[in-house]
Amino acid sequence: MQPPPPGPLGDCLRDWEDLQQDFQNIQETHRLYRLKLEELTKLQNNCTSSITRQKKRLQELALALKKCKPSLPAEAEGAAQELENQMKERQGLFFDMEAYLPKKNGLYLSLVLGNVNVTLLSKQAKFAYKDEYEKFKLYLTIILILISFTCRFLLNSRVTDAAFNFLLVWYYCTLTIRESILINNGSRIKGWWVFHHYVSTFLSGVMLTWPDGLMYQKFRNQFLSFSMYQSFVQFLQYYYQSGCLYRLRALGERHTMDLTVEGFQSWMWRGLTFLLPFLFFGHFWQLFNALTLFNLAQDPQCKEWQVLMCGFPFLLLFLGNFFTTLRVVHHKFHSQRHGSKKD
């Protein structure tokens, strides 16, 4: 090989030789990466199929145990109960395992994203995504408080109201997508607290299309005041729930992927019961909104279909939020009373 010519060209050629050597190392590293990736895919497929087989056999075993339990002698009941407990524990272990394996997206994610794999493969990535979701909720809640306050007390314009409602539609749509991804990654979000975001998306979309007029102006201030109060309560919930979750995770009593929610769950009983009056007041305000809209719909001057279409979601939100919260409170009172009787 000829020596490089002197001067700037020689320096460039020497740099190119160094780059060539580095590139060969990169090629080898990339080749190993692709091999490991293929091995990982095979392991994922094997693990998924093994878990599927185990779950199917567990279901068959649970059915057989259920059939034979009535005819068991008294001395065998303890062993049957122990077996049931172990099977439930196994189901929980499978849930944790599947959080690290690729899975098919649900209907909603398939419609929005297609068949893209949204499973994050490391604890750090899962926790970082969950943390980013929590921060997103916090920042948007603060923004919603400020905008609803501005629309309620400073500006009376259908344009700014429409911008506020558009922000609500975008916020709730984004929440539903992010929550679906978090569920795919092991977050245990209860059914209603996910579904009520779909209802809120529909409600905000209808509010966005409601034209300015007499009926809209009659309901406008009430809706903006409610939105301001709701965002304030959501801010309180995030602030106190995040601290409570941090303590419970440190004690090993909560899962690392558990989230703050816009409601009340059993783990909040210790230290967060002071939020209940705020929540119940908000629930009954939703009922008041529904009744107001149903009353407006009976007005002879009411021509807009949006009046009734907003009333029904508010009623559904009240029923879902109120009875879900009430069920949690009733369950905790019942379990505490049962525990005190045992003592």
From Swiss-Prot:
Question: On the Cytoplasmic side, which residues?
Answer: 1-132, 178-190, 241-270, 331-343
Q: Where are the transmembrane segments?
A: 133-152, 159-177, 191-209, 219-240, 271-294, 305-330
The GO terms this record gives for MF are: coenzyme A binding; monoatomic ion channel activity
Q: Which of UniProt's keywords are assigned here?
A: Cell membrane, Endoplasmic reticulum, Immunity, Innate immunity, Membrane, Nucleus, Transmembrane, Transmembrane helix
* GO BP field: antiviral innate immune response; detection of mechanical stimulus involved in sensory perception of pain; fat cell differentiation; monoatomic ion transmembrane transport; protein heterooligomerization; protein homooligomerization
- Superkingdom to which the source organism belongs: Eukaryota
Topology, Extracellular side:
153-158, 210-218, 295-304
Q: Provide the primary localization.
A: membrane
Location(s) in or outside the cell: Cell membrane; Nucleus inner membrane; Endoplasmic reticulum
Tissue pattern of expression reads: Expressed in nociceptors.
For domains, the record's comment is: The transmembrane domain (TMD) has structural homology to the very long chain fatty acid elongase 7, ELOVL7, despite low sequence homology between them.
Which family does the UniProt entry place this protein in?
Belongs to the TMEM120 family.
Q: How does it assemble?
A: Homodimer. Forms heterooligomer with TMEM120B. Interacts with PKD2; TMEM120A inhibits PKD2 channel activity through the physical association of PKD2 with TMEM120A. Interacts (via C-terminal domain) with STING1; regulates the trafficking of STING1 from the ER to the ER-Golgi intermediate compartment to elicit antiviral effects.
What is this protein's record name?
Answer: Transmembrane protein 120A
Native species of this protein? Homo sapiens
